[in-house]
Amino acid sequence: MALYKRVQQKGIKEVYEEAAYTWFNRLVAIRILMKNQLIEPVLDYVDAARTPRIVDEARMGRIPQMQERQRQLLMELLDDDSKITEQFAILVTAFCHENPILFKCFGAMSDYTELLLPNDILTEGGFIDLLNHTEFITDADFHSPELIGWLYQFYISERKDEVFAKKGKFEADEIPAATQIFTPNWIVKYMVQNTIGRIYLDNNPSAASEFKPKWKYLVEPSTPTPKEAIYKYKELTDLLVGDLACGSGHILNECFDLLYDLYIYEGYSRREAVEYIFTNNLRGIDLDTRAKQLATFALMLKACQKDSAFADAHILPKVLNMPTPIPQEQVSDRLKEFFRETPSNQIHKDLTAAFELMQEADSLGSIDRKSVV
């Protein structure tokens, strides 16, 4: 019933696309977490029949937490070797909900999503087989937090070509595919080292011998920065860095690395450094919810590589997506629901104006200019 309603609302093409994206990113994320020793090797095959470990474990009684309805269905299927794909779909869905990083980065999956797992997902040459035996992604690649962003860019490349081929004005749902650009690493390093890095050295010239040899793209000014032009701050926690079109988080990740080194240099512990960066220093926004999820995951992976205590996702980076606007015809009713009592005319007027300004937030993103007096 939920699947039927979703198809009626969005159309079958968009529902297929949502399901494909959901499975692609979560399965890639699981493989990345496995390669970084943050979870058990749940996708690895245990036999020549390509039985995933998560299915083999369930057959031995080790079943992740799940709703009772799903558990009953799983128990009915477990003894049937012809239903491995169905078993896998139920188990991996439950695993995604149970694992803190996957759940908090990507959110809950719709009830019908497991029904849309491709039937050939476990076949020879299928997606899990490729993940387990790929010759194109090395172990070093799997340790790079940027990997999932690169794969997402490849994933949407066909859609991007379609959007550009039709020419003319982009529709709101086409903007993410059209504007996803993975900035080359040297450019990102140049940007970060000559902003955060330069500000830090201007305020802490004695640190130059520590960081200048590491910052290969730092540009030396022809003359020292005048005192009145130096951006002053009291503590590292005062340095706020925002990427307002953050995509999958490439620039945020580079900012994280540089800030982390600064915190360690100043004597903070690894855990303190990560928590302060997430709490105080980094902000990201993107109109593409998918990209926002990937940016969050990439930063969480980086945090776990510094200290595995972050595997419980007790703290998350502050990466946001632009909200889907409330239709104008529903604004008045929503305001009535929000207030226990009828708001004053001025408050009602201001909030109505705010909702109107947000009507194009999911297509304009951070270039949307808002002013409510």
Locations of regions flagged by a protein language model:
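Non-catalytic, mostly N-terminal accessory regions of nucleic-acid modification and defense proteins
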Residues: 1-200, 300-324
